[in-house]
Every structure is written in C-alpha cells, then in structure tokens.
C-alpha cells in the first residue's frame, strides 16, 4: 500500500485490546482453547496439507546433519492485513463485514499462529503489535517491531497507529544475540518500507541464525517494479552487513511475482546465495498464489510472499517441509479474507534444520617436561 500523505493524520484509537486478558500459566492446549472460545460459532480455520521436501534434500539432511544432531525449527511468515486497511481501504466486496471486525479477526490470527506452533514468527502489516506482544509473551515468545515511517494506516478512521513488521521468537528455543532495523532505500533515498533483522542463537546447538523480514512496495507498473528491485538490492546489502557468514532466512511480502526482477535479484545473488523454501518443496516451482482476494475492481490471485534461505556452504539450511496454501474449493467463492481466513494473504509455514557447527579437532599436546 502507498501513503495517503495528501490527507491529514487521524488520531489513533488506542486501547481497543485492553480487555483481552490472556490466561497466565496455561498449557499450549489450554491457551489455544482460550483463543478459540470467541470463535466457537464461526467456521474453523482452513484445512491445509503438509508437503515434505524431496528425497534428495532429506537424504542430505540425514547423512550430513542428523548424525551430528542438527537442530530443527519452524518459521511462520505472514502478512496479517492491517486492521485499518482491511476495514477502510481495501474494499473486500465479497468478505462479510463481520469477518473484518477486529474483535473476531484478532483471535483468528492468534489461532492460526498458535495452531502451527512456530519457533519464529515474521509478520507484516502489524498495527496491533502490543496485543501480539502481550498474548504471545504469555506463551513464551519475545518480539520486536518496526513501524513504517509514513504508514497509510494513520490516515484512516479508527486506526490503531502505524503498521509495520514484527518478529517473535520462542525463548525456550532461541536467545537474541542482536537486532537491527532499516528504512529501505531506493537510489540512496529512504522509502516508506522497512526491514527488521535479528540474529538468534539456538540454545541446544549454540548455532546462530540471522532472520530478516520485510514488506516491499506494492502496486503494479514499470516504475513500481523498478523501485521494488532497488529495495531488494538494498535488502541484500543490509543482510550482508550483519550476517557475517551465518545461516540466514529472508522472508516477507515482496509484492512481486516470481517473474519480477526483484525475485531474480534475491534468488540469483551470490552474496548470499538464497533459495525459496516453497520452490524447494514444490520441485522448483513457486505456488500459484499466496494471496487471493476480490475487491471492487475485480478478483486477483498472485504469489507475492516468500521464505528464502541460504543454500550453500557452511551456512546452508536444510528445508524439511512446508505447509501448502489453502485449496480453491476450501477458500470458497468469497476467497480471502473470510471468517476462516483473517487476512487476504496466507501464512507460510516452513520447517528447517540448522547446519551443525564445525568445530576444530581436539588436540592433546604432549607434555615434554621432565624428559
């Protein structure tokens, strides 16, 4: 989404989530039951199938990593649809208005995240960060957030402040080493898009991992295509500035189909070498869509969201599998968002294995004293 800078900013309606009180000390099952309680009279979340990585990747994993006790983790990537945009800008003509109510949507978003039990959560269009920080915090996550410098949300009625990118990690699995944020630049000029980068240490293996999440410029046209590509170049420079040879994941809503230049920029670079997790589990092909919506100007479906990972050398991650996107027949004629799907984008859920640390051989020096 672009900026509505010709309009005056509207004071945010903060405090809309103050009455949400997540239960302390609940097990994951009990907590999920609490999340689902307000949704009891609504259709459930959409069914999805898990797709394992092809046999060669699994064979490589078993021979190279599993024997060394490689650590595995799950990552969830999702543009959750900013509430202000969903209700006052995006014109989802086939979505029941009640399905866009925040009182319903917030619990459906939480349900989607917690059902898949990710170790790392990367979100875009987050305009209720404090709620997710509080709710996910009760379940053992810590998070970070960077807002867009000129979010379109702040020009819309009933907004809750600017939207931006958020990243959460499970503290029983990872420790935060460092974090950085950046306003992406286009030809050395700051844009309205941001990136959030964290380095995490996996507690069991002590292996470090860099994760970067972003949301690139939207809309069609030759100029916008070029702007996205420049943002992609800046993104890679930002990553290499802080990665220091670690395994890395770059994920987000890139607002670009695989045929766009920015996709090639991200996946054909050698600094670092990145592959798409979903293409890996789909025999080299990206899914046909990661968003499917009907607005006032018509129906559109595109593949815009990606999870990219380092695929070479000592920083190579192993993809174990990923969750397929919802099928057309399950989406129904209204597509997304809906009562079952709280966003116009679908979450991407991927399982990875970290490469083991290469430690120097242990040498015992002979003691020649007294000889």
Predicted regions and their residues:
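Structured beta-strand-rich core segments of catalytic domains in phosphoester-bond hydrolases
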Residues: 4, 17-72, 120-217, 306, ...
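Active-site metal-binding loops of divalent metal-dependent hydrolases
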Residues: 80, 126, 216, 253-254, ...
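Residue-level marker for buried hydrophobic side chains located in beta-strands
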Residues: 75-76, 250
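Proline-aspartate-enriched helix->loop->beta-strand connector
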Residues: 106, 110-123
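Short catalytic/ligand-binding loop motif for oxyanion handling, primarily in non-cytosolic enzymes
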Residues: 83-86, 129-133, 151-155, 164, ...
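Metal-dependent phosphoester-hydrolase catalytic domains
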Residues: 2-60, 119, 222-223, 233, ...
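Generic structural signal for small/hydrophobic residues in well-ordered secondary structure
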Residues: 78-79, 109, 113, 168, ...
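Acidic/histidine-rich helix-loop elements
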Residues: 80-103, 153-154, 187-188, 219-227
